[in-house]
Amino acid sequence: MTRQANARLRLEHLRSGVPLPPTVEPWVFGRAGILTHLADLLDTVAAKSGRTYALAANYGDGKTHTLRALWHLASQRNFVVSTIALTRETPLDRLDRIYPKLIADTYLPGAAQPGIARLVLGLDADSPESHRLLEWARTELHPKLHAVLHNLLEGQSTEATEVLLGDLERMDLGVADLKRIHRTNFHTALKAPRFSALRDVRDYLRLVDYLIRLRGYAGWVILFDEVELVGRLGRVGRAKSYANIGRLAIDGLGTGHVLPVFAVASNFYTDVLLRRNDQQLAPDWLAVRGDAEAVEACRRGIALLQEAHLLQPLSPANWQQFLQNLIDAHESAYDWSSGLTGQSLWELVRAITTETDTKVRVRLRLAIQWLDLLHQYGRPPTIRTVHGIGEVDVSEEPEAAAAAEDDPAAAAPSAATEDER
């Protein structure tokens, strides 16, 4: 990609608020403290065992941008990185729905496209790694997963490869179809117990974690965005979501070298945890069901969200650095000279957005729009301030009254109309 194309790509994504593609490294200013701490956590995960982290910020103040910066930090340190934004379709209380979306946005270091196929396809069926993997899967995972790996690594049917790989990424292969593939490959019947995606999804997570370490990568970073959407679930859904967060914090849902990172809105504590009294009620809802493990995990998950590290506002110096990069990109993208510096553009933006709590996203888009207008018209845009907003009566009565004053005859009903009534 040329320098001009790269600059235009950055500007279009900044205008729209959509994160850059994972392969494009973002600009990062004012986050050195958090990234240094996360770098230490990555070292610990690679050398010892899993850790967890949560960060909080207001909407539009850079949570997703910081996650993308961590994405690149982890990738540079030989970590596999997965990203998922919670939605109505992928709620945190349903890990069976989370898993396929998570794997669909999983990148190996240096990869231009997502996916985990390379973790398996690079294994030789007769290699010690393959034998170790199959033996571990036989004793530690659901028999279905062992059968999938057995057929994938040692089976003779190449037609089934895509189907078997698809199951590792989406959990969508039925046991009946797996038995058919197994009989084709080995001419023997496969005995496999019932598989439940909701119950056994943990084994898929454990398998990916094992494959990552087996193939020589440092570990696995999982980035959860929009965690505040947990607050839109019902009370049971919220309790289960907190428990899953807690399980990821306690032991990574049975994984070894994993760093889950949760990005949550800063008002989640007051608007959800306090207002709905989830700190007390959520563990109680699980206790009624007699699940002591879930109760402890729920408390741990709530504590993690309570202690989320708050993103600090960008300083004027950070803004000037960021805006200087923005000016350079804009001038490179459209081959012109603005005559502005990061400091002068910051003064213009700050004069318009005087509120101290103005969103980072608002100021950034304002700066881009200023440069766009300056480039298009050759002069700085004129700023008009509107003082006061009044209510406007949009009902039909005032218009009808005004019409009656202008033309009384038109407003009076005709005789025919009276007869019809």
Label the predicted regions:
Residues 2-6, 178-341:
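The catalytic "switch" region of P-loop NTPases
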Residues 48-69:
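Walker A/P-loop nucleotide-binding motif
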Residues 93-114:
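Conserved NTP-binding/hydrolysis module of P-loop NTPases
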Residues 1-51, 380-421:
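A short, basic N-terminal segment
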Residues 7, 108-145:
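Electropositive, surface-exposed helix/loop patches at the edges of structured domains
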Residues 130-202, 231-232:
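Conserved P-loop NTPase mechanochemical-coupling segment
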